[in-house]
């Protein structure tokens, strides 16, 4: 799949039309998605209509933006007017939003072509996309394995060249972990940089929308298009959005990179450890100074997250009552209707997290669990603050393993939760984090390197990622998917 800039050049030079590019993406989806199952719905008519409008502009010699005519996948937890948004849940099987999310509106305004809504773990709760109420997405590198989650559909779609770029959301690693497992670039921006208006809420203090791409430059272009202040989102940061492509430089001279010591211990696959360490050594050859950094409370991120996120989910998911939207089960009383609808509509993992959250917020347990978890969250942020006094960017493995077999962890929730061990602390601290491909294991499965920046320092992440990418060939590898 060609890059955004190359496609843009072809459109401007009238070498190809937007309709041709879109048709090619739709044909690719048609050819491989029965195996990969990235998309919950393909919006072919909508896509071709958008592409025609872009071609009309070009025919009139009107200027078009970089994203005009570019095929993009949207995770199905972002509201799209008149197009079903299910959040991967049976409870929203028939929900057609009456309004547009801010990010999809920005992409519409830019002329981007949405080719479909991608699969996800139900309500974005999961690390394998096996919790979807509709289908299980496969990893394009090995169809018997998972793509990661919860944005597995978007990651797999980009890896399988079904679209050029895609949007996902990241609450505890849901962009970076699938990016790592699928061998693509995935970025979780600083909390508040991208509007959450129209994103179906899971854990409001952690959720953040971000890009998936085949290369760093495309991720920078897409972030630039969706970032920015939005008065409709009270957590949105009012800050100017730079042109992120200005940070794409081939050298790392003058940058100090910190390796988080605590991430190289127990539970890390030896092949992942070796591959990530080789990538870190490579950063030295690009001019970076590399030092070790200790974040002693990093390991408490996982237990703190599994109190905070379910607590917020318990509150957010209370709105699915079968009265206003979604499915409705017949019952004699209102309470029975709520109970029956939720029993049928919610999957097991969602029920599990609602129950955990309701418990940790209940009288007598609030101080012992929820309040304590919030204090731990502050301590983790302090560890990061101390680290960034010495270094520009922190690095560690994105995921402790490469892609695991479908069904391997479904009966053991704890081992599934451990998939996000190194990504969760970044969400708790509200920092930007990025996963870039840095090699393969013995089964030809991708390994990801995680880069972590200080608040609003996405530019430094792009600089490190781009310099690494341009001096290696991992991003050019494609899955053996016919």
Curated annotation (Swiss-Prot):
It holds the Pfam family Amidase. Heterotrimer of A, B and C subunits. It comes from the Bacteria. Allows the formation of correctly charged Gln-tRNA(Gln) through the transamidation of misacylated Glu-tRNA(Gln) in organisms which lack glutaminyl-tRNA synthetase. The reaction takes place in the presence of glutamine and ATP through an activated gamma-phospho-Glu-tRNA(Gln). Belongs to the amidase family. GatA subfamily. One of its GO terms (biological process) is translation. It comes from Crocosphaera subtropica (strain ATCC 51142 / BH68) (Cyanothece sp. (strain ATCC 51142)). SUPFAM superfamilies: Amidase signature (AS) enzymes. InterPro entries: Amidase, Amidase_CS, Amidase_dom, AS_sf, GatA. Keywords: ATP-binding, Ligase, Nucleotide-binding, Protein biosynthesis. It catalyses: L-glutamyl-tRNA(Gln) + L-glutamine + ATP + H2O = L-glutaminyl-tRNA(Gln) + L-glutamate + ADP + phosphate + H(+). The gene is gatA. It is an enzyme of class 6 (ligase). PANTHER family: GLUTAMYL-TRNA(GLN) AMIDOTRANSFERASE SUBUNIT A, TRANSAMIDASE. This is Glutamyl-tRNA(Gln) amidotransferase subunit A. GO terms for molecular function: ATP binding; glutaminyl-tRNA synthase (glutamine-hydrolyzing) activity. HAMAP family: GatA.
């Amino acid at each position: 799949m060609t890059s955004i800039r190359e496609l843009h050049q072809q459109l401007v030079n009238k070498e190809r039309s937007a309709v041709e590019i879109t048709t090619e993406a739709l044909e690719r989806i048609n050819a491989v998605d029965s195996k990969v199952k990235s998309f919950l719905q393909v919006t072919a008519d909508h896509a071709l209509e958008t592409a025609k409008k872009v071609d009309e502009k070009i025919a009139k010699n009107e200027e078009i933006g970089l994203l005009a005519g570019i095929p993009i996948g949207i995770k199905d937890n972002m509201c799209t007017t008149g197009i079903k948004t299910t959040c991967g849940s049976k409870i929203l099987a028939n929900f057609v939003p009456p309004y547009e999310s801010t990010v999809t509106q920005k992409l519409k305004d830019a002329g981007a072509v949405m080719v479909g809504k991608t699969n996800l773990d139900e309500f974005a709760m999961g690390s394998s996309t096996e919790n979807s109420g509709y289908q299980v997405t496969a990893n394009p590198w090995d169809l018997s394995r998972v793509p990661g989650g919860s944005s597995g559909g978007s990651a797999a779609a980009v890896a399988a060249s079904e679209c050029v770029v895609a949007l996902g959301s990241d609450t505890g690693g849901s962009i970076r972990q699938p990016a790592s497992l699928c061998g693509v670039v995935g970025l979780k921006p600083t909390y508040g940089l991208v509007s959450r208006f129209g994103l179906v809420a899971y854990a409001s203090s952690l959720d953040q929308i971000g890009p998936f791409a085949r290369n760093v430059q495309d991720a920078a272009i897409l972030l630039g298009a969706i970032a920015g202040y939005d008065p409709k989102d009270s957590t949105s940061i009012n800050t100017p959005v730079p042109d992120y492509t200005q940070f794409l430089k081939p050298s790392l001279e003058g940058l100090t990179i910190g390796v988080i010591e605590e991430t190289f211990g127990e539970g890390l696959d030896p092949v992942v450890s070796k591959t990530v360490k080789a990538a870190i050594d490579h950063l030295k050859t690009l001019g970076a100074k590399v030092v070790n950094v200790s974040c002693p409370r990093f390991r408490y991120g996982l237990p703190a997250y599994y109190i905070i996120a379910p607590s917020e989910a318990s509150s957010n998911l209370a709105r699915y009552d079968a009265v206003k939207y979604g499915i409705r089960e017949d019952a004699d009383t209102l309470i029975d209707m709520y109970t029956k609808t939720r029993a049928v509509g919610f999957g097991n993992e969602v029920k599990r997290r609602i129950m955990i959250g309701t418990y940790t917020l209940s009288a007598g347990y609030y101080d012992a669990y929820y309040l304590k978890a919030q204090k731990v969250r502050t301590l983790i942020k302090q560890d990061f603050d101390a680290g960034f006094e010495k270094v520009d960017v922190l690095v560690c493995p994105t995921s402790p393993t490469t892609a695991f077999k479908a069904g391997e962890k479904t009966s053991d929730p704890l081992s599934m939760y451990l998939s996000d061990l190194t990504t969760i602390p970044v969400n708790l601290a509200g920092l930007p984090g990025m996963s870039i491909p840095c090699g393969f294991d013995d089964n030809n499965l991708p390994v990801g390197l995680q880069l972590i920046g200080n608040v609003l320092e996405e530019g430094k992440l792009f600089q490190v990622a781009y310099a690494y990418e341009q001096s290696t060939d991992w991003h050019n590898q494609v899955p053996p998917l016919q």
